[in-house]
Amino acid sequence: MTRWLWVSIILTVLVTAGTVYVYFDPEFNALLPDPVPTHWNIHGQTDKWTPKAEVLPYFLIGPAAMGLLCLLTPLLPWLSPRQFSVEPFRKVYDYVMGLVVVLFAYLQGVILLASFEARGALINWLVGGIFVFFALLGNVLGQIRRNFWMGVRTPWTLASETVWNNTHRLAAWLFVGVGISGAVAVVIGVPLWICFAGIIIAALVPIFYSLWLYKRLEHEGKLDRSDLSAPATVGSDASGQR
């Protein structure tokens, strides 16, 4: 197992054990309000409450997602077709999967702390952590090669290695820029809806860019030769053998 997978497994065990302990320990349980706040809107206001006796499944959603990621980390490379293998960027793949687990661990801690107070005052910490994640992800986004599991996977990036690489270079700059500026914006008190607008822009621009770039290269006849070759049909194979 890789170092990042070990980190993910250890974090998952610790977060799961910590969550269960917080719920069942008499002292911590006594501090939980009843009902417990389990969802907050974009303004940090609680908009969903759950009876204390029924809140444990909500608390375990994060650890369950972390456990699923630990299972998928070694499984997805095995499932990948040879042409879209993650092996050429395996270290980056392991890093990204581990980074997502770390994000879930951080969010779990913030959510547990926020559950002890109805005002959801820690919402800025939650959003700020997401922006830091975007910046760290953007730092390696340009190193991800064509695959089916992570990155900007549009029909045009998957169809052309050139489009994939150029799109991910652009996405890397956008993610780092939005991640850093968004984290700073949260700290100085910019409204959260403005911060989230940056995430939407960073997610949509690479999609439209990949379409534009593919069509431009196609029009100019500059698509990779390997991208232009179509798989042979059964009929053509049979005729070629005769």
Placement of each model-derived feature along the sequence:
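Ordered, amphipathic secondary-structure segments that act as subunit-interaction surfaces
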Residues: 71-122
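Membrane-water interface of transmembrane alpha-helices
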Residues: 28, 66-80, 136-152, 210-220
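Select subsegments of transmembrane alpha-helices in polytopic membrane proteins
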Residues: 4-11, 58-63, 69-71, 93-103, ...
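Cytosolic, membrane-interface loops and tails of multi-pass inner-membrane proteins
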Residues: 40, 44, 80-85, 147-162, ...
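Hydrophobic core of alpha-helical transmembrane segments in multi-pass integral membrane proteins
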Residues: 8-23, 63-75, 105-108, 133-135, ...
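Active-site and channel-lining beta-strand-loop segments
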Residues: 22-57, 150-159
